Curated annotation (Swiss-Prot):
HAMAP family for the chain: Ribosomal_bS20
Domain of life: Bacteria
Annotated protein name in UniProt: Small ribosomal subunit protein bS20
Ranges of biased composition (kind: Basic residues): 7-20
Species in which this protein is naturally found: Nitrosospira multiformis (strain ATCC 25196 / NCIMB 11849 / C 71)
GO biological process: translation
GO molecular function: small ribosomal subunit rRNA binding; structural constituent of ribosome
Length: 87
């Protein structure tokens, strides 16, 4: 239990930061799912448009430190490879 005023404030901040981080992480997963769904639809133009939108989201979340920049690069690379592999 937080006893000092400083510890109580940090506990409050941790809750709000955790909620924000969970929301952003969910946004990341949703962006990736949209691209995967577009790839599954076999429409390359739609997939590329979804990919472009997701890249901005992925980079934004990586810049905020929610995920590591290498993880962001890995996601983008795999999505890009999947789009390039489309016929």
């Amino acid at each position: 239990m937080a006893n000092s005023a400083q510890a109580r404030k940090r506990a409050r901040q941790n809750i709000s930061h955790r909620n924000r981080n969970m929301s952003l992480r969910s946004e990341l997963r949703t962006a990736i799912k949209h691209v995967r769904k577009a790839i599954g639809s076999a429409d390359k133009n739609t997939a590329q448009a979804a990919y472009q939108a997701s890249v901005a989201t992925i980079d934004s979340i990586a810049d905020k430190g929610i995920i590591h920049k290498n993880k962001a690069a890995r996601h983008k690379s795999r999505l890009s490879s999947a789009i390039k592999a489309m016929a």
